[in-house]
A protein has these predicted regions:
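Exposed, interaction-prone extracellular/peripheral surfaces
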Residues: 4-190
């Protein structure tokens, strides 16, 4: 799945959860970033606010700029004046970005409930599990397996920091988010 499709799936899942939250009377805010914050809606409440959230979500686009988690999550944290559920849609591309993200997340989880949404990387899983037919297939499988292990290490560290993590297929991203949101509400964690 190309990066643009991943962004579209994440935005669709965010809109689905925003709709459910607004219908339930909760406040919702949309915040998007890459190297710097790009889209922010401010906090809104009520079903009538969904059109504005949709309009702001339409401004979210793919960017080739490297994600700056430190700047974005620090900026977001400064805007939040009460304990909030912060949902972060992301994929980990390299260990350095992941390490910087982990440093910032640790500070964010001290005050907020943080939920990471990630799409399963079916392509990597397929490469890692594919029986080799040629020598280069072995190298691809080993590399894919290493990347998947690195991803699991980061997920484990996020959980140790107190963040919740959902890894779902692209088809289940929205429903999985709504299910977890409703579960967190039912458990009175919000």
């Amino acid at each position: 799945m190309c990066i643009r499709d991943r962004v579209d799936r994440a935005v669709t899942a965010a809109l689905l959860s925003a709709f459910i939250a607004l219908k339930g009377g909760d406040m919702v805010s949309l915040f998007s970033f890459d190297a710097r914050p790009r889209v922010t809606s401010g906090a809104v409440r009520g079903s009538a606010s969904f059109a504005m959230i949709q309009k702001r979500a339409a401004e979210i686009d793919y960017s080739s700029e490297e994600t700056n988690f430190t700047l974005a999550l620090t900026t977001l944290s400064a805007k939040l004046d009460r304990r909030s559920l912060v949902i972060v849609f992301t994929d980990f591309v390299d260990p350095i970005s992941a390490e910087l993200m982990l440093l910032t997340v640790g500070r964010l989880t001290e005050r907020h409930l943080v939920l990471f949404m990630m799409m399963k990387d079916v392509e990597l899983e397929t490469l890692a599990d594919m029986p080799p037919a040629a020598p280069e297939d072995v190298a691809r499988a080993v590399t894919a397996g290493n990347l998947l292990r690195e991803r699991q290490v980061v997920i484990g560290r996020l959980r140790l920091l107190g963040a919740h993590v959902i890894e779902a297929s692209h088809q289940r991203l929205g429903p999985a988010l709504v299910e977890r949101y409703l579960q967190l509400k039912q458990e009175d964690l919000l």
